[in-house]
Amino acid sequence: MAKTYDYLFKLLLIGDSGVGKTCVLFRFSEDAFNSTFISTIGIDFKIRTIELDGKRIKLQIWDTAGQERFRTITTAYYRGAMGIMLVYDITNEKSFDNIRNWIRNIEEHASADVEKMILGNKCDVNDKRQVSKERGEKLALDYGIKFMETSAKANINVENAFFTLARDIKAKMDKKLEGNSPQGSSHGVKITVEQQKRTSFFRCSLL
């Protein structure tokens, strides 16, 4: 049976328990939101195929448990990941502080060239905010990675975050291929117009 995709990207969602990783995953994969998700036990994944630059890209997105007792399970899944989203809850200071710990785990266990992005989730709950957008932006700048604020509940920037990460992974792959090509021709990566319409980019921030 012929493959229905051109590329397969393995992505990870990591962060403390309760920051909304499962909700972000379901919003992107199912366009659904459920406020009664229990904490993920172990690891689960969802698949969604998107189109970038005329290529079909299958995203295999792993939802890893944030609790400390599952850390030994999740670290086995860092290897092979091409993109990692580090998620914190803007209403939970501790989850933001722990992003640095998660980054250390990535540096220890993941591929050196893995694409990373920080997501400040639950930006719809601004009246309970404990972490300013500027602090999220500065943290991302410190590590040289991208940042967005998202809301799985209000469907803000979730689509855009996954497309941005996938686009960066594909651009890096294309650059490597060009380096091995005698022509060295360039290939731009674009989000389709249809997908652009589905994003909610303007309501929260992107760095």
Swiss-Prot record:
Cofactor names: Mg(2+)
Tissue occurrence: Highest levels in spinal cord, heart, kidney and lung.
Catalytic function, reaction form: GTP + H2O = GDP + phosphate + H(+)
UniProt xrefs under SUPFAM superfamilies: P-loop containing nucleoside triphosphate hydrolases
GO MF terms held by the record: GDP binding; GTP binding; GTPase activity; myosin V binding; protein kinase binding; protein tyrosine kinase binding
Residue positions of motif Switch 2: 63-80
UniProt KW Cell membrane keyword: yes
Entry keyword annotation includes Nucleotide-binding: yes
GO-annotated cellular components: actin cytoskeleton; centriolar satellite; centriole; centrosome; ciliary basal body; ciliary base; ciliary membrane; cilium
Modified residue annotations for Cysteine methyl ester: 204
Post-translation changes: Phosphorylation of Thr-72 in the switch II region by LRRK2 prevents the association of RAB regulatory proteins, including CHM and RAB GDP dissociation inhibitors GDI1 and GDI2. Phosphorylation by LRRK2 is required for localization to stressed lysosomes.
Annotated membrane topology: Lipid-anchor
Keywords: Autophagy, Cell membrane, Cell projection, Cilium, Cilium biogenesis/degradation, Cytoplasm, Cytoplasmic vesicle, Cytoskeleton, Endosome, Golgi apparatus, GTP-binding, Hydrolase, Lipoprotein, Lysosome, Magnesium, Membrane, Metal-binding, Methylation, Nucleotide-binding, Phosphoprotein, Prenylation, Protein transport, Transport
EC number: 3.6.5.2
Family: Belongs to the small GTPase superfamily. Rab family.
Function text: The small GTPases Rab are key regulators of intracellular membrane trafficking, from the formation of transport vesicles to their fusion with membranes. Rabs cycle between an inactive GDP-bound form and an active GTP-bound form that is able to recruit to membranes different sets of downstream effectors directly responsible for vesicle formation, movement, tethering and fusion. RAB8A is involved in polarized vesicular trafficking and neurotransmitter release.
Domain note: Switch 1, switch 2 and the interswitch regions are characteristic of Rab GTPases and mediate the interactions with Rab downstream effectors. The switch regions undergo conformational changes upon nucleotide binding which drives interaction with specific sets of effector proteins, with most effectors only binding to GTP-bound Rab.
Subunit structure: Interacts (GTP-bound form) with MICALL1; regulates RAB8A association with recycling endosomes. Interacts with MICALL2; competes with RAB13 and is involved in E-cadherin endocytic recycling. Interacts (GTP-bound form) with MICAL1, MICALCL, MICAL3, EHBP1 and EHBP1L1; at least in case of MICAL1, MICALCL, MICAL3 and EHBP1L1 two molecules of RAB8A can bind to one molecule of the effector protein; ternary complexes of RAB8A, RAB13 and either MICAL1 or EHBP1L1 are possible. Interacts with EHD1. Interacts with MAP4K2 and SYTL4. Interacts with SGSM1 and SGSM3.
Protein name: Ras-related protein Rab-8A
